[in-house]
Amino acid sequence: ITASRENEGSYETVLKYKIDDEETTEKTIKSGEIFTKEEAVREAKRCFKCRCRDCIKPCVHLQRFNIAPKSYIRNINHNERIIQGTHYANKMILSCTECGLCGVMCDYDVDMKDVVKETKISMVERKKMPQSAHDFALKDMKFSNSEKFFTYRKEPEKENIKYVFYPGCQLPASSPDYIEKIYKYLTDNINEGIGLMLGCCGAPADWSGQNELMKETAALIKNAWVELGKPTFILACSSCMSNFKKYMEEINFISLWEVMDEYELPKLNASQSLKLNIHDPCTSRNTNMQDSIRNIVAKINCEVHELKYSKEFTKCCGYGGLVYFANREQSNDFIDDRIMESNEDLLVYCTMCKDLFTSRGKRTFHMLDLLFSDDLEKSALQKMPTLSERQHNRMHVRNNLLKNIWGEEVMYEDEKYNIKINDNATAKMEEMYIVLSDVKKSVENSIENKERFFNPSDNSYLTRLRIENVTYWVQYEVNEEGITVTNVYSHRMEVVEANNEDIR
């Protein structure tokens, strides 16, 4: 009678159920020897629906897909085993920011960050990763580690250096004016020699499961580090710290915020009478920089109110895991969820956190705004640069630093044609992840090789150009002032031309 019926009736489970958010009611008192029907119903309603959802409550990703880790892992397993057919779980997998909050919340050490990471690596190795999901982010990383941005130098007139400042790729892209100010601050306060290195740590490769590309990026950084004399890195980005820890263990590093906490702060240019909620980037989880930031804020007399989910329990802004590129709707869910938790202006110390929060209209300060900005009001709603502007800003930072600090002459690319982009085309470029340099290449090719269609009804030209794995279509007009691009489009299909004999 009792065979295979161990878990029926009353028994002790492994479930650890927290009742902090539950409403409790008084025990129902029996009016007689046994409960009446009404009393029994009332007493039964006091029972909690005991399901462990601690990881789901703070995660808009698990909420959007209405799934718990156990089912998530089962779906991933099924997705991995499909040889032919539709991989239905791809979108879900690529919508995880890999922030690790679910692992922190879980009493059973189930961390979807690790599961999703391994799954992405497997998808890449089996050639099942959708190319479009992370393509632009990887190309942007390639740009940042090209000669247009990647640079390293020792401090002028110093043979040996103890430190090298590495701002990452997003801070120069969004706040280019701060990089030289930070470097000057560091050289003014530290006498042991401070070098500079510009580039990308490889976070896009890590987040997209591109293991080989990540190894190449780590090797690029390590080779430059050896040439500089193996200095300690001063990192301004928490994602850089995470990547250095995972892939470059032999390199010593410290966060910029720990350095600033130790030394005297810059003289402030703007008044500080702010009430702020601090948002910790998810890659700062379990690091010393969280305390350093709070120490710095206390020194400049800002009033800080902690968010419900902060420090070890902080949430992702919506950029992690490259979700911003793979699933923009899910990314917006993360952004809006974090904004709704905040009653004050936000204070962040991650560039992408600031860019994403301000993109949804939330007043947000970067820690560097409080230390170096001349206009805090303007900084609070600073518009997120376009993808093309981000690359331009990186080149601008590199060229200015080489000229102003190292006295090197920098060669600028000549503009062959006066090309302007109207508002419609600019919006389409952002939507489709098209950068200005590719639009210019398309226009230049059409003019020089006469590869274009002419539309006499509106005097416009239409051209296409295949660059790497994307075909770009550009519509433009020619007038006395130059060339105006009016529309753009891109796709991954390759347009193959055939001669008349092939057609027959």
Language-model region placement:
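Ferredoxin-type iron-sulfur electron-transfer modules and their immediate structural context
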Residues: 1-95
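Long, charged amphipathic helices and adjacent flexible linkers at domain junctions
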Residues: 2-17, 130-144, 256
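A short, charged/proline- and glycine-enriched loop
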Residues: 38, 158-166, 270-276
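Redox cofactor-anchoring modules in respiratory/redox and cofactor-processing assemblies
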Residues: 40, 263-410
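Iron-sulfur-cluster electron-transfer modules
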Residues: 48, 54, 66-251, 382-401
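Phosphate- and divalent-cation-binding pockets in alpha/beta enzyme and binding domains
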Residues: 58, 105, 239-246, 316, ...
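Short beta-strand scaffold positions
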Residues: 234-235, 347-348, 420
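Ribonuclease/tRNase effector modules and their secretory precursors
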Residues: 381, 385-387, 392-504
